[in-house]
Design a protein with these regions (language model features):
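Hydrophobic alpha-helical transmembrane segments that constitute the membrane-spanning cores
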Residues: 77, 111, 115-145
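Residue-level signal for the membrane-embedded core of alpha-helical transmembrane segments
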Residues: 76-83, 131, 159, 163, ...
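Residue-level hotspots within the lipid-embedded alpha helices of multi-pass solute transporters
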Residues: 91, 126, 158-162
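Hydrophobic, aromatic-rich alpha-helical transmembrane segments
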Residues: 63-75, 115, 119, 123, ...
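Long, hydrophobic alpha-helical segments
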Residues: 68-94, 98-100, 111
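Membrane-water interface at transmembrane helix exits
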Residues: 89-93, 137-141, 169-173, 177
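Transmembrane alpha-helical segments and their membrane-interface loop/helix boundaries
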Residues: 1-68, 150, 156, 160-233
Length: 233
C-alpha cells in the first residue's frame, strides 16, 4: 500500500479517533436520516374534499427512503467535500511550514504515488466517517427502490468532485502559509460552488455547475425521487 496513505491512516485513525469520529458520524447520520425517513414514510397530507380537512395519506416506506436520500447525500458531502477539503489544505500547509513536505519530495516515489497518498491519506478520518453512512445508503437504495445505474452515476460524479476539491485544497495549502487560513479558504471555495452557483445559473452562467454534483442530481436522481409522488397525484 502507498506509504503516505498508511501514514495518514496510522496518524488520523487511532483508536480514540475512530471512536470519536465513528460516534459523531453515526449519531449525526442516524438522527438526520431516520428523522427524514420517518417523516416521509408517514404519508403526505391530503385534502379531503368532502370534509375540507387535511388528512395523512397511506404510509409509504418507499417515499420515506426517497425523501431521506437527499439529506444523506448532503451529509456525505459535508464529510468529504467540506471537512475533508479543509483537512487536506490545513495539513498540507502545516507540513510545508514544518519542512516535512520537502522531505517527502526526496523520497523515491513517483509524483502520481505522492499525490495519491496525500489525497487519500490526509482525509482518512473523513473517509471513515463517510464509510459509516454506507449502511444508511444501502437501506435507502433497497427500501426506496432506487435505480442502481442512477446512484452509481451520481456517486461517480460525487467522488470525482471530491478528488477535484482535495486537489484544489492541496494547492491552496502549498500557497497559503497558515494552516487555519488554508483550511477555511478551501472550504469557502467549496461553499461558493454550492451556495452562489445556483444564483449564477439562474442568470444563465451555468458553466461552473459542472464542477459540482448538481447536474447529475437534478438531471437523474431528483426526477426519480419525485416520480412516485407525482404518480400518486
Amino acid at each position: 500500500m502507498n506509504p503516505l496513505i498508511v501514514r495518514g491512516i496510522r496518524e488520523r485513525l487511532r483508536v480514540k479517533h475512530l471512536i470519536a469520529a465513528g460516534l459523531f458520524s453515526l449519531i449525526l447520520c442516524s438522527t438526520i436520516y431516520l428523522s427524514a425517513y420517518l417523516e416521509g414514510a408517514e404519508g403526505d397530507w391530503v385534502l379531503d374534499r368532502e370534509t375540507q380537512n387535511w388528512k395523512r395519506g397511506e404510509p409509504s416506506p418507499v417515499e420515506g427512503a426517497r425523501q431521506a436520500f437527499t439529506y444523506l447525500l448532503a451529509l456525505q458531502g459535508f464529510f468529504l467535500m467540506f471537512l475533508g477539503t479543509g483537512r487536506v489544505a490545513a495539513i498540507t500547509a502545516e507540513e510545508k511550514e514544518s519542512g516535512l513536505m520537502d522531505y517527502q519530495r526526496m523520497t523515491p516515489m513517483n509524483p502520481f504515488s505522492k499525490i495519491t497518498g496525500y489525497l487519500f491519506g490526509l482525509p482518512a478520518r473523513e473517509y471513515f466517517m463517510f464509510a459509516v453512512t454506507l449502511p444508511f445508503l444501502l437501506h435507502c437504495m433497497i427500501v426506496g427502490e432506487l435505480s442502481i445505474d442512477n446512484v452509481l452515476h451520481l456517486y461517480f460524479v460525487f467522488f470525482s468532485s471530491v478528488v477535484l476539491y482535495h486537489l484544489t485544497a492541496h494547492v491552496i495549502g502549498l500557497v497559503v502559509p497558515k494552516p487555519r487560513a488554508a483550511s477555511w479558504v478551501s472550504r469557502i471555495v467549496v461553499l461558493g460552488l454550492y451556495v452562489f452557483l445556483p444564483a449564477f445559473g439562474q442568470a444563465g452562467i451555468s458553466l461552473l455547475s459542472f464542477l459540482t454534483i448538481l447536474p447529475p442530481y437534478f438531471g437523474k436522481m431528483l426526477p426519480e425521487l419525485i416520480s412516485r409522488q407525482s404518480n400518486d397525484y
